[in-house]
Amino acid sequence: MRRCTKNSRSTNPPRDPNTLSNYNAFRTTHTTVNFDILFEKQKLTGNVMHKLISLTNLEAREVILDSSFLNIHDVKVDGKQSKFELLPRQEPYGSALKIPLAEGVALSKTLDIDITVETTEKCTALQWLTPAQTSTQKHPYMFTQCQAIHARSIFPCQDTPDVKAVIDFNISSPLPVIASGVPVNDVSSSSSKSKNKVYKFHQKVPIPTYLFAMASGEIAEAPIGPRSRVAASPDKLEECKWELEADTEKFMQAIDKIIFPYIWGEYNVLILPPSFPYGGMENPIFTFATPSVISKDRQNVDVIAHELAHSWSGNLVTNASWEHFWLNEGWTTYLERRILAAVHGEPYRHFSAIIGWKALTESVERYGKDHEFTKLVVDLKGKDPDDAFSSVPYEKGFNFLFYLENLIGKDKFDKFIPHYFTKYKEASLDSYEFKSSILSFFSSDSEAHALLTSFDWDKWFYSPGLPPKPDFDTSLVDIVYALAQKWRTASESGFSPSAVDVNGLVANQLVVFLEQVLVFEKPLSAEQSKLMGDKYGLAKSENAEVLNMYFQVGLKAGDKSVIEPTAAFLSSIGRMKYVRPLYRALDKLDRNIAIEVFEKNKSFYHPICRGLVQKDLFGNKGS
């Protein structure tokens, strides 16, 4: 929330260009959702109730909410039937729901709006899985993914991170339900005839709509720490428990010390079916995580450190709009690496940052070094925030904070961290407020203040392309850089690879090695690529990070023996981190096969993933 007087809201335009709501006139403070999950019809039906506070004095004569592809049946204002109008659709933001008011509302007075609604088959936030798409193949499954602007396709709302509300969930389903609130233990049957139960949750900490989350299906739970549980398909529960129980509480204790203790009560992880498009989604109480975390070697759990860190950066202190997404993701990546340093040692933080720098360079190369989306603060007016999704806000944001840490010194920066998260707790802010808060905090420290005022903030915020590269500790990557060099010069040196080359390397070191190979000016030959896979056992790995990179190397080398396993991998996982680059690589090697594999699997992918892969393969024309 902007630090300003309430009266000024009526004259200030909203900070978020990706909402159609008039949230500068009214602000949601409490939302209650009552939904029936109808698996056979693949829709949600019910009502949503918003309590809104007036930010003007009798000025606004309408409430405008975001909505997208919804069937709206009825609207009540303060208990009385109201007219409403769905305005013409404005891509990519949906159809604004306009609710006229009989009279203006006095400053700080509240308004209750009750909307009867159902989702449609065009909903972009819901994914419905048939029993065949789940691991036990017994029951259907449903989950939500609302970030960035998809909550509006579940219910009308002020779909902006600049607004936060307390949420109550009352969800009727024939299968267990998980939501981004704390369970209220009075599960009741919907009716005497119904097999459904009503699952109730309460989220007492105000959250933005993109953190609204639900999942329902065949879900079982097990403890993974004193304040944590894992939820997963029953047949996967034990392996998920084993994967996460060694590190989750260690991560929590580490970040508790860096900022301040975790305030949400429980920290739990839901391992979703494989079509989930992200590594993780930081939904409060329950992180929604990709099954690629489960690598049977505990080496992909960095995702959990990242999503846990979101409990402070993003969920508690939030970017005011997606133009300032680095405030969520740059901070979270920075905190994730501080957790890893506390648990594994400082060199591991630098090792993770080196991997991140590689991802950043790839994003900048793909967009072009002058592209708007390679800036830290981006212009998203009229644009879809999903189109700007890349490693840039994560890694350029991390490097900015790492730069500030090195500029003023780690000890001083460490004192700012808890101050920042305390000052903006339960609020939303933009980059300019971040700048003013750090300058203000160090105003009495002449040395730090001089350093912070003398460097070029605008260059960091608005310059496209790569930032200055930090001086990373390369101790954990030197060994794999050396191995990559042997492969680079193999044809001249007669290098003969063997399994001993990779003995003792962790999965992330293999990933860095393969990343180095992938950027050779002269790619490996198909024969070399196949030899590497055979000698190092790469094709047999159960670690998705390793498989993803090995398949990219093989496709670039023209090694046709990796086409079939790549296609199988693409039919088994929907995480965009893997799916998008593999389709791009497959497209370069054999466009017909790439299109054939996509057409076969597109209904398996989440709508967000499906839409972005379509753009990668076909441009904006779709398939």
Swiss-Prot record:
This is Leucine aminopeptidase 2. It comes from Ajellomyces capsulatus (strain NAm1 / WU24). PROSITE patterns: ZINC_PROTEASE. Aminopeptidase that preferentially cleaves di- and tripeptides. Also has low epoxide hydrolase activity (in vitro). Can hydrolyze the epoxide leukotriene LTA(4) but it forms preferentially 5,6-dihydroxy-7,9,11,14-eicosatetraenoic acid rather than the cytokine leukotriene B(4) as the product compared to the homologous mammalian enzyme (in vitro). Gene3D superfamilies: 3.30.2010.30, Neutral Protease Domain 2, Peptidase M1, leukotriene A4 hydrolase/aminopeptidase C-terminal domain, tricorn interacting facor f3 domain. Keywords: Cytoplasm, Hydrolase, Metal-binding, Metalloprotease, Nucleus, Protease, Zinc. It comes from the Eukaryota. The active site is at residues 307, 394. Its EC number is 3.4.11.-, 3.3.2.10.
